[in-house]
Design a protein with these regions (language model features):
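Non-catalytic substrate-recognition and accessory regions of acyl/acetyltransferase enzymes
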Residues: 1-68, 72, 76-132
Length: 132
């Protein structure tokens, strides 16, 4: 797999940032737009209890392995923080221009269409840290 940079940084470089800096960038409580490889992603990250909530609202472009790169980075971050699980919420159901490839990827990876409280219908999956 090709190396996928996120805003010009490798996943290792991102994880090398001090916790305070990384938390300020990613856990601001606001939606965040960033580039990963050739994809532009609109996402929000938050910690609730022992879970890291990852909400992907839009992914434009990509296809070169962006999701596996993000998954690995996010799980490594959650492990470092001592969190017990990662909850994935992916809004790929009601897009004006649906990404059919993304839908196939979500289904192949075992995501289920769920009515998520406060969100509505979305692809949803919980990964227990150490069991994914």
């Amino acid at each position: 797999m090709n190396r996928i940079d996120i805003e010009g940084y490798t996943p290792d470089e991102i994880l090398d940032l001090p916790d305070e800096q990384l938390d300020a960038l990613a856990l601001s409580g606001e939606p965040l737009v960033f580039r990963a490889g050739t994809a532009e992603i609109l996402a929000e990250f938050k910690v609730r209890g022992e879970s890291l909530i990852v909400e992907l609202a839009q992914i434009d472009g990509g296809g070169e392995g962006v999701l596996p790169t993000l998954t690995s980075l996010i799980h490594r971050y959650a492990t470092r923080r001592g969190l017990k699980r990662v909850e994935w919420i992916v809004h790929a159901l009601n897009c004006a221009e649906p990404n059919l490839k993304l839908r196939r990827v979500m289904e192949r990876r075992g995501f289920q269409i769920t009515d998520v409280e406060g969100v509505g219908k979305a692809y949803y999956q919980v990964h227990e840290i150490g069991f994914f």
